[in-house]
Amino acid sequence: MTNPSVPINRSPWLPDLLWICLLAGVATIPFLTPALDLKLLSLFYHPGAERAWPHEFDSFWRFLYTFGPWPALLTALTALGVLVAALSKPALARWRRHAALIFLTMALGPGLFVNTLFKDHWGRPRPRQVTELGGTMTYQCFYEKGIAGRGKSFPCGHSSMGYYFVVFYFLARRRHRGLAIAALAGTALYGTLIGVARMAAGAHFASDVLWSAFFPCVIAWGLYYFVLRIPQAEDNPEQGAGSAILKSRWLVWIAPPLAVAMLAAILFGTPAFAEIKHDMKSPAGTPALRIDVHQCRITLKANPDLQDRILITGEAQGFGWPWSRIRHSALWTRTNEAWVLNFTCKPKGHFSELDGEVTIQMPPGTRVEQTAQTN
């Protein structure tokens, strides 16, 4: 029986589709040319400064970068737990569809579409990688597909974990309109703050952030209205316990590996950072230099003001397991001909992404014996 307190709407999904289309337009039209994306990123970029992206190290942005995705992950795992517990606890049966919406939006939105299908394969260079912002790659608009794996800017995975909370707008919209609007506003604020944190680090463009909102919104919309059919289930409580799939005992076997996979995906995306600074005075004479650097761009500069010193500055950053580290060292060794500075910068552990920039200033005439790089 239809609940008389809920107004009848033959196309209840249409208003939500309209604002999602508006979101897509805002994420698209202003960014059809590079101007706005580059202008917004230039607010955080300071060429010539000791750190080109100094706001990356502001404690507030750093906190959001490191811990921002965790509330979404814990929410999705809790929903998965409710799905499994409902198999043996009748009191939870009425929440099956709601829990499925919360979990599936995470699995399909930030999980499948954002971080797997697009981010790993679209190939858009990050802001700090493009020539206009101090890098070496050509700027690429969000709608231009690049070389898979060469750039992981589009869309922003971190901010998609903030925008994921749009699921609570859908769950509240029919009976708690004010709460739904508050959930939508809070979601927009949280996801955008995480996105700005990534922009401040030179890791994502504004268009990456806005498009990361589109994916969880449209997926939650489709699941809510057409797959899980939650409005119909709420109007017919006797059918609201869920479909046969949601009642299946297979969930007991599927849930643990799903939970482990989601947790592993988040852990494998743990940020790692290393600030590189070595001011090395040569024991005697004009030194030589041996370089062994992985996944970093190297710039060599002859500096007449450095007669007996080698100055190494830069930074490296990436994503990997929590125990993965970026190790670097600079040590003098004596050969038959001269003193040699051995500079190394290598990852320890496994990384899903690693990038960095190193500038080496040295006296004119310094012999570079070896340069090993992996890009």
Please identify what each model-predicted range represents.
Residues 1-5:
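Short, intrinsically disordered terminal tails adjacent to the first/last structured region
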Residues 6-151, 160-189:
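Hydrophobic alpha-helical bundle signature of multipass membrane enzymes
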Residues 10-15, 140-249:
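Membrane-embedded catalytic cores of phosphoryl/pyrophosphoryl-handling enzymes
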Residues 26, 290-293:
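N-terminal mature-domain "stem" immediately C-terminal to a signal peptide or N-terminal signal-anchor/transmembrane
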Residues 41, 193-197, 344-345:
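Regular secondary-structure segments
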Residues 78-86, 221-229, 265-266:
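Alpha-helical transmembrane segments
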Residues 96-112, 244-272:
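Internal/C-terminal transmembrane anchor helices
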Residues 267-288, 295-375:
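Acidic (Asp/Glu) and glycine-rich low-complexity loops/linkers
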